[in-house]
Curated annotation (Swiss-Prot):
<dbReference type="InterPro" id="IPR006976">
    <property type="entry name" value="VanZ-like"/>
</dbReference>
<dbReference type="GO" id="GO:0005576">
    <property type="term" value="C:extracellular region"/>
</dbReference>
<keyword id="KW-0961">Cell wall biogenesis/degradation</keyword>
<comment type="function">
    <text>Unknown. Confers low-level resistance to teicoplanin.</text>
</comment>
<keyword id="KW-0614">Plasmid</keyword>
<protein>
    <recommendedName>
        <fullName>Protein VanZ</fullName>
    </recommendedName>
</protein>
<dbReference type="Pfam" id="PF04892">
    <property type="entry name" value="VanZ"/>
</dbReference>
<keyword id="KW-0046">Antibiotic resistance</keyword>
<keyword id="KW-0964">Secreted</keyword>
<dbReference type="InterPro" id="IPR053150">
    <property type="entry name" value="Teicoplanin_resist-assoc"/>
</dbReference>
<dbReference type="GO" id="GO:0071555">
    <property type="term" value="P:cell wall organization"/>
</dbReference>
<dbReference type="GO" id="GO:0046677">
    <property type="term" value="P:response to antibiotic"/>
</dbReference>
Length: 161
């Protein structure tokens, strides 16, 4: 699979994460800035968020870990893991600075766990499947999921706006 396709998918996934985490899948990006209330929780797993939200945070970062491995095989596990952690922390800091939603250490932890699982899942899968085939499967499924997300959001917007 070409580097252009895999790097393009990683870039699209990063944009999707930004859209999802910071802008809550809103088409009107400015609407998230109407929140005007800062909320900061530094005690893990105690905020008013529900269990489902924590699971969702883990799930949305698993593909990110997978795509980091597809695109940056020459970089070791720890730098990629650190990047996932820093990205998640950056999202939460941006949410706090601009008063977008709630800033929660639990989100940093669950996002990072998701990225960790993606990184490890790739390593485990790589032991049982040819690397090129694994990369193709990840890229194909990634493209399919991004298309489904866009169709889902477009459908919601058309039918419910």
């Amino acid at each position: 699979m070409g580097k252009i396709l895999s790097r393009g998918l990683l870039a699209l996934y990063l944009v999707t994460l930004i859209w999802l985490v910071l802008f809550k899948l809103q088409y009107n990006i400015l609407s998230v800035f109407n929140y005007h209330q800062r909320s900061l929780n530094l005690t893990p797993f105690t905020a008013t968020g529900n269990f489902r939200e924590m699971i969702d945070n883990v799930i949305i970062f698993i593909p990110f870990g997978l795509l980091l491995n597809v695109n940056f095989k020459e970089i070791g596990f720890l730098p990629k893991f650190a990047f996932v952690l820093v990205l998640s922390l950056t999202f939460e800091i941006i949410q706090f600075i601009f008063a977008i939603g709630a800033t929660d250490i639990t989100d940093v932890i669950t996002n990072t766990v998701g990225g960790f699982l993606g990184l490890k899942l790739y390593g485990l899968s790589n032991k049982h499947m040819n690397q090129k085939k694994l990369d193709r499967v990840i890229i194909f499924v990634g493209i399919l999921l991004l298309v489904l997300l866009l169709v889902y959001r477009t459908h919601l917007r058309i039918n419910y706006v």
